[in-house]
Amino acid sequence: MGYRKLGRTSDQRKAMLRDLATSLIVNERIETTEARAKELRGVVDSLITLGKKGDLASRRQAAKVVRDVEILNEDDTTQTALQKLFGEIAPRYTDRQGGYTRVLKAGPRRGDGAESAIIELV
C-alpha cells in the first residue's frame, strides 16, 4: 500500500493535503495528527524538490498543488505561497538531497486522544 487513506475519499484527501501543504509553506510549522503529518512529508518534499529545479514547468507543477494564498511580510509587501516556495524556501535546501521536513510527536490530542504531531521545515 503506497499511501494512507486518512478516512476520506480520494478527492477529499487530495484537497486536505493541498491545504496542509500550503499551510506548512506559509507558516513553516504546523500541528496536525501523526498520520496526516507523515503523509504530508512526501507531498512537501516533492514540492521543495520542484522549487529547487526552478524552471517554468516545475513552477506550473507546484502551482497545481499549492493554493493561491497571499502572505503579508514584515515590510508590508505581499507574496503568494508559491512565490515563497520558489523564492525563500527552496534556495535554503540547495545542498540537501531530500529530507526537508521533520515530524515531532506531540502526544495525544485533548479532545479525542488522537496522536498529534508537529511537522516543520528543517
From Swiss-Prot:
Keyword Ribonucleoprotein on entry: yes
Alphabetized Pfam families for the sequence: Ribosomal_L17 (PF01196)
Molecular function as annotated in GO: structural constituent of ribosome
GO CC aspect terms: cytosolic large ribosomal subunit
SUPFAM superfamilies in UniProt: Prokaryotic ribosomal protein L17
InterPro entries documented for this protein: Ribosomal_bL17 (IPR000456), Ribosomal_bL17_CS (IPR047859), Ribosomal_bL17_sf (IPR036373)
Keywords: Ribonucleoprotein, Ribosomal protein
UniProt record, GO biological process: translation
Keyword Transmembrane helix attributed: no
Recorded family membership: Belongs to the bacterial ribosomal protein bL17 family.
Record PANTHER family: LARGE RIBOSOMAL SUBUNIT PROTEIN BL17M, RIBOSOMAL PROTEIN L17
HAMAP family xrefs: Ribosomal_bL17
Subunit structure: Part of the 50S ribosomal subunit. Contacts protein L32.
Designated name of the protein: Large ribosomal subunit protein bL17
Lineage: Bacteria, Bacillati, Bacillota, Bacilli, Bacillales
Gene name of the encoded protein: rplQ
